[in-house]
Amino acid sequence: MPDVTLTTLQGLKQKGEKIVMLTCYDATFAKTACDAGVEMLLIGDSLGMVLQGHDSTLPVTVADMAYHTASVKRGNRGAMIVADLPFMANATTEQTLNNSALLMQAGAHMIKLEGTAWLAESIRLLADRGIPVCAHMGLTPQAVNLFGGYKVQGREEAQAQQMLEDAKSLEAAGAAMLLLECVPSELAARITRAVQIPVIGIGAGSDTDGQVLVLHDMLGLSLSGRVPKFVKNFMREHGDIPAAIAGYVKAVKAVEFPAAEHGFSA
């Protein structure tokens, strides 16, 4: 697979071809995902839950993220690597710059930050220094305690309108991509149409520019036994892991996944 760049992603959005992203935490799965056609590998702080066994992403450290980013880089075969900046790793300007630099040096091509309009300053800071940023909006797991749990965001019209305005402001600040998690499908479609940058969804309907799932979820693996509504177990239809990942890629590209049953209404 030729190297995926921001230009590649922008071209896919303009053509209306869906972008496929999958979380990944090690070299072997990175190669397997690339061989299946996955275009973006996300080293998510979800590793705190699916690998480390925590009940949230909050305990994950920058050192954890750098270790797994470097592991994924070794197995990567052309996908764009996106790494999460973990909880409070961007609390100050100095921390934002230093921690983002560590993840870029470990092999990331883009840094993902969770938040709303207040992220604009951090996004400008990084973009001005040549670091692409993905802004993660909607249900942001690092704020789970503020939300009172893992709940759909943007169902009320005022909140939906604010999210739409926030998306525009983060694009204006220099965000290279947006990720929308657990928002009503109609709102995600509105945001996707309102911005020029690619929009990736998870639990955000089929009208975003691309999709992402947690690797363990789409393989039917769960420590807690809880399966989010937006997840499909691709192992049920395929005989092995490479085939399951290839099935996920095919389903996203064909706009067969997510189906209506995987989304949320306002």
Curated annotation (Swiss-Prot):
Query: Residues that bind 3-methyl-2-oxobutanoate, according to the entry?
Result: 45-46, 84, 112
Q: Which reaction does it catalyse?
A: 3-methyl-2-oxobutanoate + (6R)-5,10-methylene-5,6,7,8-tetrahydrofolate + H2O = 2-dehydropantoate + (6S)-5,6,7,8-tetrahydrofolate
| EC code(s) of this entry | 2.1.2.11
Top-level taxonomic group: Bacteria
Signal peptide location: none
Q: What is this protein called?
A: 3-methyl-2-oxobutanoate hydroxymethyltransferase
Identify the Pfam families for this entry. Answer: Pantoate_transf
* Quaternary structure and interacting proteins, as annotated: Homodecamer; pentamer of dimers.
Q: Which InterPro entries does the entry link to? A: Pantoate_hydroxy_MeTrfase, Pyrv/PenolPyrv_kinase-like_dom, Pyrv_kinase-like_dom_sf
The UniProt entry's sequence similarity note says:
Belongs to the PanB family.
* Native organism: Stutzerimonas stutzeri (strain A1501)
